[in-house]
Every structure is written in C-alpha cells, then in structure tokens.
C-alpha cells in the first residue's frame, strides 16, 4: 500500500502511474494496463472518481477491475487522519475486515486534505438496502467484529484513542446544544407538547448519564460513528458486509459505547415498525458475536441498558442539523423524520429520566 506519496488528481491518473501502484501492491505482475476510464461520481462530503481498468491478456485474477478515488478537501471539519487510518492502518491486522481494500492513501501534512484509493465493490454490493431480518443479523455480526478489534481501554489506546472524559463529552454536548433553541422554534407548531418536554428533559438530564457511564470502561470501543444505510455495502448474491466512510467531525465522539453504532442505525434510519420488529434480534446477534470474538465481561442486561442510554443521542443529531440555517431548512425532510423516529424509540424504551 502506498502511503508516503501524493495521489494524482483524477484527470492526471495515467496507465504508468496506476501500473506501478498495482505492482507495488502485488496484484499486477508483468502484464500491464491496456486502458483506463475515469468518471466522476456524486458525493456529499468528498470528490469521488471511479477508475475502470482493462488489462493486457494474462493479468492476475485478483487485479482490480475498478477502483474508487475519494478526495476530501481541507477545512471539511473532520478529525484529521481518521478516515485514512480507518482504511490504511487501524484494521490491517483484523483478518477479513469488513472494510474495502485500500491501495493508496495520503494526507497533506500542511492542510489535512486527503485522498484514498480503494477497491470498488459496486458490482457486487448495494448501498441503502432495505432492512430485513438477515440484513440486520449480518450487519450486527460485521459490526461486532470491527468493534472487538478496538474493544476495551488497552485496544482503544493502541488505536490512538481514549475513553471520552467529561471534557470531551462537554464539547460534544456544547456543540449540539447550539441547535436546541432552533429545533424547538422550527417545530413549534408541528410536534406535541410531550415531545417538546422530552427534548428539554434529554438536554437537561441525559448528559449526566453519559458522564456517569464513563466511570465503567466495559462496552467502550472505537466506534464508526456514522453507520447509516449509505455507508453499508451489502452483498447482492452472497458475501460479506463492508462499512464505508469513518469520517467523524471534530466535535464527534470517536470512542464510545459500541452499541451506539446500532442505535444510530436502527433508531435514526429504520422505519419505526421495522425497528420494533428487528432490533432485539439484531442486538442479540451483536451480543453473541461479541462473545464469539472474545468479549467476556459484557452482559446482555448491560448491553440493553447501554442501547437505551444511546437512543437519546439521535435527538442530539437532530439538534445538530438545526445549528446552521441552510441545514435547518434544506435538510428538514430528513431531521424531522429522524426526530419522529427518535421520539418513538425514546418512549418505547422508557428513556425518560
């Protein structure tokens, strides 16, 4: 894998550069590349280019036929190096990791912009898969394997993390709290008083519960932080699940309860009835896989308590959408739905203080 040299701009990638790179990665021997085609793809927080490759006869069977080049500009607000480390460093020792193979990555040491060249799985996997029973089990299993690799204080530290202390939690809460008044104003006429009271109760009482939970390190890991359907690659005809885009913002919690990645997905992105039908099965599978992968000190009751603790964090995500006026208006279709789902889960699980 190439880490020490800049990756060319998509319109400057040519056959000699790509041939040398693939040979360095051990997936191309003497045969060369016949043709490449580079096309831009839409993306929210990055520039994406798809590189399709045709080889001379006799190329190695594992030589990639398509690659994705992701470029993130300086000033995007993400934690420096996090995504590059996700693809190119943190999980290299995790056998069969649920992460696309990375062929090259580079971070600009001056401004923090970065590029990642990875395998393109779009021919075998889909994004935004509608949740079902098997989907939920496979996502839970893959997520448990990822979490176990960074599970507990010792492994968290090996990945340059630490369990969030009060100062980190204070910064997180202070950031999302900026959107609270705007959220309440934007929903002044279209949410019931019960929801309004619940939102206020969450911001008043829930942070203390988060602080108290950090006194016990059990259940903490390096979290992905954005396990949404668009970041889950699900196999079309069998195979493993992959997770894309660990891109925490500078205010995000990068180390937190592992089950928070599942509450984020199921509460925020699944229809309420889908969540109600599937969530316990998904949580049971996640817990089984934690145990099967070596976690011995995290009981089922504690996992359920942690899941319940993490549900109100979806309201923090909604409040964060309301900080900037353009997001508040442009993304109302999304955050209003997320709020509704969060409130149903909040009352389903009895999360009130």
Language-model features: where?
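Glycine- and acidic
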Residues: 72, 125-129, 244-247, 264-272
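AlphaC helix (C-helix) of the protein kinase catalytic domain N-lobe
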Residues: 87, 143-146, 265
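Conserved structural core of kinase catalytic domains
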Residues: 104-138
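ATP-dependent phospho-/nucleotidyl transfer catalytic cores
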Residues: 125-224, 235-237, 334-337, 345-352
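Active-site activation/catalytic loop segments of kinase-like enzymes and analogous catalytic loops
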Residues: 85, 251, 255-294, 311-331
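Conserved NTP-binding catalytic cores of kinases and kinase-like/nucleotidyltransferase enzymes
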Residues: 1-113, 235-241, 353
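Active-site acidic catalytic loop and adjacent metal/ATP-binding pocket
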Residues: 40-58, 204-258
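Regulatory N- and C-terminal appendages and interdomain linkers associated
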Residues: 1-43, 56-64, 154, 210-217, ...
């Amino acid at each position: 894998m190439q880490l020490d040299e800049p990756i060319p701009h998509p319109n400057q990638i040519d056959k000699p550069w790509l041939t040398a790179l693939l040979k360095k990665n051990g997936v191309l021997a003497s045969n060369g590349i016949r043709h490449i085609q580079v096309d831009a793809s839409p993306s929210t927080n990055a520039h994406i280019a798809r590189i399709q490759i045709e080889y001379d006869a006799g190329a190695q069977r594992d030589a990639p036929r398509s690659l994705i080049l992701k470029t993130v500009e300086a000033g995007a607000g993400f934690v420096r190096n996090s995504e590059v480390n996700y693809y190119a460093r943190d999980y290299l020792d995790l056998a069969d990791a649920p992460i696309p193979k990375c062929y090259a990555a580079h971070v600009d040491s001056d401004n923090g912009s970065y590029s990642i060249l990875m395998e393109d799985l779009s021919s075998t996997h889909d994004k935004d898969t509608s949740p079902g029973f098997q989907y939920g089990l496979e996502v839970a299993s893959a997520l448990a394997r990822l979490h176990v690799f960074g599970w507990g204080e010792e492994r968290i530290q090996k990945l340059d993390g630490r369990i969030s202390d009060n100062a980190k939690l204070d910064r997180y809460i202070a950031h999302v709290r900026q959107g609270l008044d705007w959220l309440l104003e934007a929903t002044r006429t279209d949410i019931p008083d019960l929801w309004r009271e619940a939102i206020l109760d969450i911001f008043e009482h829930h942070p203390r519960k988060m602080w108290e939970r950090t006194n016990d390190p059990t259940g903490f890991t390096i979290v992905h932080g954005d396990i949404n359907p668009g970041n889950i690659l699900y196999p079309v005809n069998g195979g493993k699940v992959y997770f894309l885009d660990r891109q925490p913002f500078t205010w995000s919690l990068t180390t937190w309860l592992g089950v928070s990645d599942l509450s984020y997905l199921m509460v925020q992105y699944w229809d309420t009835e889908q969540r109600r039908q599937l969530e316990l099965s998904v949580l049971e599978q996640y817990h089984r896989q934690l145990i099967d992968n070596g976690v011995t000190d995290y009981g089922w009751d504690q996992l359920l308590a942690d899941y319940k603790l993490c549900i109100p964090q979806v309201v923090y995500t909604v409040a964060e959408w309301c900080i900037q006026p353009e997001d508040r208006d442009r993304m109302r279709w999304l955050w209003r739905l997320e709020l509704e789902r969060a409130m149903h889960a909040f009352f389903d699980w009895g999360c009130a203080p």
